């Protein structure tokens, strides 16, 4: 009689006298490193109030605090495009205000510079971003891919500011009052 793989597993668990709680603990800790994090290619950003912290992986015990992904440049981008828990609408002014009220290691946030974003943008960052999003999705966390328009600190004219497109690596300018579904909240710390 052929045993199924599950029957074999049950037999082994019984032989080794492994309890259900030991098995559950082992199962839940697979793939984690000694810090209890599930490793990700790019660091993840966690938000508690107006304070941001960065960890080199997914901390399932802080899943509700998970805010975003840190790019190679150090710029932090929200998990998803659009408004939401960050800003009521994604105008330049509202995103700038949000950035300024957030802190990281005691420093206040600012809008990122288009030059900093451009310097690190490319296939390497995109591949790391995709791998990071994959880990998040495996753990039932919604995250958009390497896309979105990020408002930059540089102003073009009084009513216009630069934005950077993650999708194609270009920057352009737009009315500060414009919003779009592909706007992505992002901030930097100097």
Locations of the language-model features?
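An exposed tryptophan-centered "aromatic clamp" motif
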Residues: 93-109, 114-176, 188-190
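Short, compositionally biased
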Residues: 2-107, 159, 178-190
């Amino acid at each position: 009689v052929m045993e199924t793989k599950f029957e074999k597993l049950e037999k082994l668990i019984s032989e080794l006298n492994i309890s259900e709680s030991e098995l559950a603990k082992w199962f839940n800790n697979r793939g984690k490193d000694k810090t209890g994090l599930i490793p990700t290619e790019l660091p993840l950003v966690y938000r508690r109030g107006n304070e941001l912290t960065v960890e080199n992986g997914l901390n399932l015990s802080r899943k509700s605090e998970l805010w975003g992904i840190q790019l190679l440049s150090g710029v932090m981008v929200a998990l998803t495009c659009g408004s939401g828990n960050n800003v009521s609408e994604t105008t330049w002014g509202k995103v700038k205000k949000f950035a300024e009220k957030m802190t990281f290691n005691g420093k206040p946030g600012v809008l990122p510079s288009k030059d900093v974003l451009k310097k690190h943008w490319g296939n390497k960052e995109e591949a790391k971003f995709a791998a990071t999003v994959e880990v998040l999705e495996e753990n039932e966390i919604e995250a958009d891919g390497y896309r979105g328009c990020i408002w930059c600190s540089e102003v073009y004219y009084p009513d216009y500011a630069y934005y950077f497109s993650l999708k194609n690596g270009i920057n352009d300018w737009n009315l500060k009052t414009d919003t779009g579904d592909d706007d992505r909240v992002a901030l930097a710390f100097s």
